[in-house]
UniProtKB/Swiss-Prot annotation:
This enzyme's EC code(s): 3.4.21.46
Biological function: Serine protease that initiates the alternative pathway of the complement system, a cascade of proteins that leads to phagocytosis and breakdown of pathogens and signaling that strengthens the adaptive immune system. In contrast to other complement pathways (classical, lectin and GZMK) that are directly activated by pathogens or antigen-antibody complexes, the alternative complement pathway is initiated by the spontaneous hydrolysis of complement C3.
Active site per the UniProt annotation: H66, D115, S209
Entry remark concerning the domains of this protein: The self-inhibition loop inihibits the serine protease activity in absence of factor B (CFB) substrate.
Gene name, Swiss-Prot/TrEMBL: Cfd
Post-translational modification: CFD is activated by the removal of 5 residues at the N-terminus, named activation peptide, by the MASP-3 isoform of MASP1.
Family: Belongs to the peptidase S1 family.
GO biological process: complement activation, alternative pathway; Notch signaling pathway; protein maturation; proteolysis; response to bacterium; retina development in camera-type eye; vascular associated smooth muscle cell differentiation
Protein known as: Complement factor D
Lineage: Eukaryota, Metazoa, Chordata, Craniata, Vertebrata
Keyword check for Disulfide bond: yes
Residues annotated as glycosylated: N46
Disulfide bonds: C51-C67, C149-C215, C180-C196, C205-C230
Keywords, comma-separated and alphabetical: Complement alternate pathway, Disulfide bond, Glycoprotein, Hydrolase, Immunity, Innate immunity, Protease, Secreted, Serine protease, Signal, Zymogen
InterPro entries the UniProt entry points to: Peptidase_S1_PA, Peptidase_S1_PA_chymotrypsin, Peptidase_S1A, Trypsin_dom, TRYPSIN_HIS, TRYPSIN_SER
């Protein structure tokens, strides 16, 4: 990868960012089986959940770059692993400080392209049955329309904005990209690096940004954006495909990249 990677040390999110943006947004789902998704991460600012993430290595969590929009360095960003409930004591739950955040060099606040980032934890996660990385999808292929995939998160579960305390899960059906690009849907905005899932009253919602779309046993994509009104069938959920970015991710994880460091 020849582009520089921008690394921001100990940066944080403002909770309002993921709440107010029409991006990444589980509505119409159900409570997930406790600890059945040991890769799930909760990105937290000052102790409040703001975005989801996926543990992809013992010290790295993959999420969405737009979760960084409007950040300030005066707040505290942490990553919670091993959790089902955000508030109840659980034996496998641990809150990790963040050493650094690496934004994809192509990501921008005014664009939905290249919407990925990586959190480097302050130290390696304690791995086991309840905390375990999920493999990346490495095959750069189109997921067949109608394929059922899994999303999970702690995002809002009602249009009124109610947030759950326990992890929610939803099975979604993959939509053909050409259909998703019709004028009646996303009107040409879906690039080859994105994919869509049907969202008729069942959708990711605010606070689910950055979480994984899991097809089979791998991270297929990352929750990115959709409609301001979650569950709008005319605005399918949009995800950033992971396979295209595997070389960048692996370069970041291995340290084989040129980085710019700012405070």
């Amino acid at each position: 990868m020849h582009s520089s990677v921008y690394l921001v040390a100990l940066v944080v999110l403002e909770a309002a960012v993921c709440v107010a943006q029409p991006r990444g947004r589980i509505l119409g789902g159900q409570e997930a089986m406790a600890h059945a998704r040991p890769y799930m991460a909760s990105v937290q600012v000052n102790g409040t959940h703001v975005c989801g993430g996926t543990l992809v290595d013992e010290q790295w969590v993959l999420s969405a770059a737009h979760c960084m929009d409007g950040v300030t360095k005066d707040e505290v960003v942490q990553v919670l692993l091993g959790a089902h409930s955000l508030s109840s004591p659980e034996p496998y739950k641990h809150l990790y400080d963040v050493q650094s955040v690496v934004l994809h060099p192509g990501s921008r606040p005014d664009s939905v392209e290249d919407d990925l980032m990586l959190f480097k934890l302050s130290h390696n996660a304690s791995l086991g049955p309840h905390v375990r990385p999920l493999p990346l999808q490495r095959e750069d292929r189109e997921v067949k329309p109608g394929t059922l995939c899994d999303v999970a998160g702690w995002g809002v579960v009602t249009h009124a904005g109610r947030r759950p305390d326990v992890l929610q899960q939803l099975t979604v059906s993959i939509m053909d990209r050409n259909t998703c690009n019709l004028r009646t849907y996303h009107d040409g905005a879906i690039t080859k690096n994105m994919m869509c899932a049907e969202s008729n009253r069942r959708d990711t919602c605010r606070g689910d940004s950055g979480g994984p779309l899991v097809c089979g046993d791998a991270v297929e994509a990352v929750v990115t954006w959709g409609s301001r009104v979650c569950g709008n069938r005319r605005k399918p959920g949009v995800f950033t495909r992971v396979a295209t970015y595997v070389p960048w991710i692996e370069n970041v994880l291995s340290g084989n990249v040129s980085v710019n460091v700012t405070a």
